[in-house]
């Protein structure tokens, strides 16, 4: 049984020292697409965290009963089932956001973070540790999404969560929104800048030269 210290390390590690986007550079595609607004970034974070945590839990519970030859198929079946549930919940209770997220909720099925944690961690680790690892990786993914979404929505549209923060010139204010920040390529450069800042502050995260 895992103790509290181990659980804390498993939960906080992916957020601080082993971030799936900043260190491992996984899950970047969806990060480029859903970060033009804080609302979509937050919902995507919750969706991926729920799927990653629950898939880790169920796969870990079944790990001793899954034949090695079909383990990837079983993992994808479990992940796909959870994604369908999440997608249906979003369409029922947050339809407008679900429309904005479009296919990217469905693409959680093939998200590198979810698949990677299922194969590399949940298949070898007890259920509670696997569940916390899923939450940690989801929150680590979300930390980058929300950071990028904050910059893109605030300076690209002058608002946060749809609430005007910077009064726009078109409405008689002073701020001229930077429309470039609302385009997907801007997220690529922002994520790159974040990774550069993190690796400057933490040199140990820089890959060793071969």
UniProtKB/Swiss-Prot annotation:
GO terms for cellular component: plasma membrane. Keywords: Cell inner membrane, Cell membrane, Ion transport, Membrane, NAD, Sodium, Sodium transport, Translocase, Transmembrane, Transmembrane helix, Transport, Ubiquinone. Belongs to the NqrDE/RnfAE family. Its main location: membrane. This is Na(+)-translocating NADH-quinone reductase subunit D. Composed of six subunits; NqrA, NqrB, NqrC, NqrD, NqrE and NqrF. NQR complex catalyzes the reduction of ubiquinone-1 to ubiquinol by two successive reactions, coupled with the transport of Na(+) ions from the cytoplasm to the periplasm. NqrA to NqrE are probably involved in the second step, the conversion of ubisemiquinone to ubiquinol. It catalyses: a ubiquinone + n Na(+)(in) + NADH + H(+) = a ubiquinol + n Na(+)(out) + NAD(+).
